[in-house]
From Swiss-Prot:
Cell compartments where the protein resides: Endoplasmic reticulum membrane; Cell membrane
Subunit (UniProt): Homotetramer. May also form homodimer.
Keywords attached to this entry: Cell membrane, Endoplasmic reticulum, Membrane, Receptor, Transmembrane, Transmembrane helix, Transport
Family: Belongs to the TspO/BZRP family.
CC terms in the record's Gene Ontology section: endoplasmic reticulum; endoplasmic reticulum membrane; mitochondrial outer membrane; organelle membrane; plasma membrane
GO annotation (BP), single: lipid droplet organization
Tissues in which the protein is found: Expressed in erythrocytes (at protein level).
Identification of the protein by name: Translocator protein 2
PANTHER family attached to this UniProt entry: PERIPHERAL-TYPE BENZODIAZEPINE RECEPTOR, TRANSLOCATOR PROTEIN 2
Signal peptide per UniProt: none
UniProt function note: Cholesterol-binding protein involved in the redistribution of cholesterol from lipid droplets to the endoplasmic reticulum. Required to meet cholesterol demands during erythropoietic differentiation. May play a role in transport processes at the plasma membrane of erythrocytes, including regulating VDAC-mediated ATP export, and import of the heme precursors protoporphyrin IX and 5-aminolevulinic acid.
Any GO molecular function: 5-aminolevulinic acid transmembrane transporter activity
Membrane disposition: Multi-pass membrane protein
Length: 170
């Protein structure tokens, strides 16, 4: 993999890094503690999975770029333009969830993102089948994050659904 490949692999990580740098003072553990779902993975697991998925998706975009001749030509506009839009939406979800604390709006963006990733896979498939297949783990991950976000949104609307802390008996 050439230098361009490394750039494509690293590019998806730029958004989360910038979001963290500019909003770290506003982030809090608002979705932890009693709000934490029993089936939600630990924060470090979420971070590792997200990092791996961003790297795989970045590599897939490199394969498409390479197969379309590289450069910045017109054939790249739709496949990589759609990819750029989905990256932007993905980064927006981070802001909505972790800094604005709006799981409802984050959920809407996640559903939009899901549709964009499916569209990207369909457009990439004739160009590079492997690139399209590499988006499947991303779709699976979006399913998990959408379910988590849905539950947090539902619990914020209806307190009766919120998980109650269990009392430990001595």
């Amino acid at each position: 993999m050439r230098l361009q490949g490394a750039i494509f692999v690293l590019l998806p990580h730029l958004g989360p890094i910038l979001v963290w740098l500019f909003t770290r003072d506003h982030m809090s553990g608002w979705c932890e503690g009693p709000r934490m779902l029993s089936w939600c993975p630990f924060y470090k697991v979420l971070l590792l999975v997200q990092t791996a998925i961003y790297s795989v998706v970045g590599y897939a975009s490199y394969l498409v770029w390479k197969d379309l001749g590289g450069g910045l030509g017109w054939p790249l506009a739709l496949p990589l333009g759609l990819y750029a839009v989905q990256l932007t939406i993905s980064w927006t979800v981070l802001v909505l969830f972790f800094t604005v604390h709006n799981p409802g709006l984050a959920l809407l963006h996640l559903l939009l993102l899901y549709g964009l990733v499916v569209s990207t896979a369909l457009i990439w498939h004739p160009i590079n089948k492997l690139a399209a297949l590499l988006l499947l783990p991303y779709l699976a991950w979006l399913t998990v994050t959408s379910a988590l976000t849905y539950h947090l949104w539902r619990d914020s609307l209806c307190p009766v659904h919120q998980p109650q802390p269990t009392e430990k008996s001595d």
